[in-house]
């Protein structure tokens, strides 16, 4: 099909829930993608921080292809070798003991909150309150929607799930004012992504940990976007040393294949009993092959340390743009290869300018250019992205 036909057919049948660019993607290799008209782009968005190893990484392609030829799906009523292998590497990467596999970040967060609710109610029937942060994003299922701190996502659905409280991100006094013994969990992103790439202080996270301990509330870190070496550590909580009670993951853990879940320490392993939670597709052999290949490749290629190094280089280059355009760039922040460049005006024209110059970036929170490239991006490709941003800023 040609571009026009593909777009028309998609628009005819797909629910109109996405604001799409008029592009048809066809091929990816490394950090580059091509549309069906042959145009090549440097991708600094990675499918929203998903394609950890870039496109068509040979180890990942081989693992998925070989597993597809053996066993694509198997009920969790039975054991598989590839799931056992995937569980071990996820436990090692997260620093946790027990894993539950799901299919998307919202599912992982939903399961984490469900476990926290059961934990709380087992202590007291009124211990079910969950506190999360303004400007957060945790998913679009009904409970994750209630935990998400954006009014935009709440409008038009009537009453949201009860028992959720929102407080300003980074404000320990606001959190303390809401904390009591009826709180079963505090759910936070260790770095806010959708809210504008906001990095909290270590002190704030340490104080949150202390409040949770004081009130016997579980600390849940949503690492859907920050996890899997994205910030220059296996998981972002490792920067502060503040370990959560529940850690959720998704996006980059499958290298492009849909996988998600949550991880807990041994002391929470038996909050759920058989039948309390589950899922038909979570932890299927194909997904587990992707997880195992992705995590072992990140380790063997030393990508955690490389991300920290390249992220510092990238951030410094963005700061040079801030110095060059002080009236247009108001802040540069982030960690590793999760970076945000805040601009004085709307961010959308900058994204569109970059796209016209064959570079893919994203705008979040209205005026923050979000940069979350594949972990394998080279310095030469970083320079291409920075040059496109420079050109966009000069023109706006």
Predicted regions and their residues:
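Conserved N-terminal phosphate-binding loop of PLP-dependent enzymes in the Aspartate aminotransferase
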Residues: 1-396
């Amino acid at each position: 099909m040609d571009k026009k036909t593909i777009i028309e057919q998609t628009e005819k049948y797909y629910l109109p829930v996405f604001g799409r660019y008029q592009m048809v993607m066809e091929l990816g290799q490394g950090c580059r993608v091509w549309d069906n008209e042959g145009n090549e782009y440097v991708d600094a968005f990675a499918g929203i921080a998903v394609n950890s190893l870039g496109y068509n990484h040979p180890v990942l392609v081989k693992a998925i292809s070989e597993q597809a030829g053996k066993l694509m799906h198997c009920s969790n009523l039975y054991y598989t070798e590839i799931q056992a292998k995937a569980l071990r590497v996820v436990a090692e990467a997260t620093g946790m003991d027990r894993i539950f596999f799901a299919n998307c970040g919202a599912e992982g967060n939903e399961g984490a909150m469900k476990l926290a609710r059961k934990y709380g109610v087992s202590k007291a029937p009124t211990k079910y309150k969950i506190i999360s942060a303004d400007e957060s994003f945790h998913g679009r299922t009904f409970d994750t929607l209630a935990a998400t701190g954006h009014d935009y996502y709440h409008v038009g659905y009537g009453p949201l799930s009860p028992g959720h409280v929102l407080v300003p991100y980074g404000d320990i006094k606001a959190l303390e004012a809401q904390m009591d013994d009826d709180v079963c969990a505090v759910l936070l992103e260790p770095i806010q992504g959708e809210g504008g790439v906001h990095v909290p202080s270590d002190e704030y996270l340490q104080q949150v940990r202390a409040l949770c301990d004081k009130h016997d509330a579980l600390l849940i870190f949503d690492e859907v976007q920050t996890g899997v070496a994205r910030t220059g550590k296996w998981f972002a909580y490792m920067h502060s040393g503040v370990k959560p009670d529940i850690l959720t993951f998704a996006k980059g853990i499958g290298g492009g294949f849909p996988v998600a879940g949550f991880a807990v320490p041994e002391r929470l392993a038996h909050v759920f009993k058989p039948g309390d939670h589950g899922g038909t597709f979570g932890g299927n052999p194909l997904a587990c092959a992707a997880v195992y290949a992705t995590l072992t490749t990140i380790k063997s290629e030393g990508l955690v340390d490389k991300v920290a190094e390249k992220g510092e280089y990238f951030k410094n280059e963005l700061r040079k743009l801030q110095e060059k355009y002080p009236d247009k760039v108001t802040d540069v922040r982030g960690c590793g290869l999760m970076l945000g460049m805040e601009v004085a005006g709307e961010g959308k024209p900058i994204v569109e300018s970059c796209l016209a110059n064959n570079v893919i970036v994203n705008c979040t929170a209205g005026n923050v250019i979000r940069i979350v490239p594949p972990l394998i991006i080279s310095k030469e490709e970083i320079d291409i992205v920075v040059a496109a941003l420079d050109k966009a800023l000069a023109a706006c």
